[in-house]
Amino acid sequence: FKGGGPYGQGVTRGQDLSGKDF
């Protein structure tokens, strides 16, 4: 996965740090 949550490109997981999918 490529980061796309509220933390931007730095989060490279299936979920962001809030636990939301992206």
From Swiss-Prot:
Keywords: Chloroplast, Plastid, Thylakoid. Disulfide bonds: none annotated. Its main location: plastid. It is found in: Plastid, Chloroplast thylakoid lumen. It comes from the Eukaryota. GO terms for cellular component: chloroplast thylakoid lumen. Residues 1-22 are annotated as: Disordered. To A.thaliana At2g44920. This is Thylakoid lumenal 11 kDa protein. It comes from Spinacia oleracea.
